[in-house]
Amino acid sequence: MTTLSPENSLSARQSASFILVKRKPPIDKTEWDSFFDESGHLAKSRDFICVNILERGLHPFVRTEAWKFLTGYFSWQSSQDERLTVDSMRRKNYKALCQMYEKIQPLLENLHRNFTETRNNIARDIQKIYDKDPLGNVLIDKKRLEKILLLSYVCNTQAEYQQGFHEMMMLFQLMVEHDHETFWLFQFFLQKTEHSCVINIGVAKNLDMLSTLITFLDPVFAEHLKGKGAGAVQSLFPWFCFCFQRAFKSFDDVWRLWEVLLTGKPCRNFQVLVAYSMLQMVREQVLQESMGGDDILLACNNLIDLDADELISAACVVYAELIQKDVPQTLKDFFL
């Protein structure tokens, strides 16, 4: 067991306070540009920028460019000229992947049953997406989205297609202009978040660590969840598979949380602290009504239209509480 530094706890509490008080507005284009010198090299530290993103967020006009740094699409050490070269390379690589896919598609159709099944699943999922805004304007191109999802499935050997990827990819398509940007940002997002939303890689680990965290911080609640509420925590896998996007009131709230996850602030695997904070929202009701697993799951599924800043702030407070304690090595290794 290791006690973590109180300075980290103070920093996390300060971040939580900054988020709610909103002492400064989100980082806008003028401020973002001030982070770089004339050649496009970073003039501020990466840590400084990431802490500001945690505490303040990004203005929508900045998000596209900032996410390219946060995901690793661009190196933080690159110049403007180097970034132009990298973007051109990523465009060419995407085009080459598309050409490769067109060549091997007949082979995949004939030899791999999983390919045909997955392609049909993607097509069905795409049709479920509501692609218009309240005024009836078309938001996304479903054909382009389907193509990118298929290519992602064929090229990504680690993260097979799963339900939820279509909604996640849609948010990337809404953020950027070009298909190669959508494709690469999604791949880098999965890598940067340690595949935490992928069922066969990160989701089970998240659920196990969520149970461990509840046991450590809230033994009374943990006892109920292990008894009458058995199975409830393991049933929360959609939170991680969809990266919480169905819990928020707007796309901006989803992007706000995701960009915090990308900063790695205030810690790694922040998504588990977010899930813990959401469970705390139903805790009193669960205990007072002595809910069973199905009712707990229903109460959790009713957590919608959440405010991202409030949830991020609550999770920062949980982290501050956690690191003041004698933390088990498993939790320390997971969050640090």
Swiss-Prot record:
Gene that this polypeptide is encoded by: TBC1D21
This protein's domain notes: The arginine and glutamine fingers are critical for the GTPase-activating mechanism, they pull out Rab's 'switch 2' glutamine and insert in Rab's active site.
Lineage: Eukaryota, Metazoa, Chordata, Craniata, Vertebrata
Expression by tissue: Expressed in round and elongated spermatids (at protein level). Expressed specifically in adult testis and very weakly in fetal brain.
Species of the source: Homo sapiens
Site (Glutamine finger) location in chain: 163
Keywords: Cytoplasm, Cytoplasmic vesicle, Cytoskeleton, Differentiation, GTPase activation, Spermatogenesis
Gene Ontology BP terms: flagellated sperm motility; plasma membrane to endosome transport; sperm axoneme assembly; sperm mitochondrial sheath assembly; spermatogenesis
Protein's name according to its UniProt entry: TBC1 domain family member 21
Domain Rab-GAP TBC as annotated: residue spans: 57-265
Locations listed in the record: Cytoplasmic vesicle, Secretory vesicle, Acrosome; Cytoplasm, Cytoskeleton
GO cellular component terms, semicolon-separated: acrosomal vesicle; cytoplasmic vesicle; cytoskeleton; extracellular exosome; sperm midpiece
